[in-house]
Amino acid sequence: MHTCNAPRLDARLAAAYDFVRPGHAAADIGCDHGKLSAALAGSGRCPLVLACDLRPGPLEKARVTCAPYGDKVQFRLGSGLAVLAPGEAEDIIIAGMGAETIIEILEAAPWVFDARYNLVLVPATKHSILRRWLARRGFALRGETLCQAAGRWYAVMNAQYTGDAREPDGLYCLTGLTQGQPGCADYYAVQNAKLKKYRLGLPDGAEKDAVGALIAELDRLAAG
């Protein structure tokens, strides 16, 4: 974890920081207040950080936060990865948005389907959807960190393109690489509560039975 005088990171952003490779230029997509960009530049972990946001207000806040780091941080206003040229940054962080939005951003930038890029993804919602999409589109999870921030569970994912597309099973989509991590039982309980609610609305049949089996498996994992 960084030790510079940049703003303190919450557990979610600290986990994202740790997945960024030292010595590589990074793009912070959805940089918001710029705290992660400041930490990456201020600690010397990245020689260049491209702080990017769709909205002028947050980008201006990021300019203020990152001002002490001069030209180590550059700023881009625009949507997703459209503000970058391929290869401009090889470590790409996308945080602060739901899984569907992250997927839309990646689908719109086919150049990230390349093993040179290190993706750090922090979905605010629907973690299982993102895990499924990554597997189907040929990305492998290289690491995953469970953490809590502002009372919510986050799964910070580190992914890289391999071209090995596969159909993941339901349990993998729900748990990824989180088994055995601190807090995983509580995380699984949250996932299971959503599954149980979903199952109540299903008619009797194969899907309802499959969801019931997943619920039982998550209960087993949560119990240790």
Task: For each feature predicted by the language model, list its residue ranges.
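S-adenosyl-L-methionine
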Residues: 1-24, 38, 60-86
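Conserved SAM/SAH-binding beta-strand->alpha-helix loop
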Residues: 55-56
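Conserved class I S-adenosyl-L-methionine
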Residues: 23-32
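Class I S-adenosyl-L-methionine
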Residues: 2-12, 82-83, 88, 100-224
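Short beta-strand element of Class I
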Residues: 47-52
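Short SAM/SAH-binding signature in class I
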Residues: 89-96
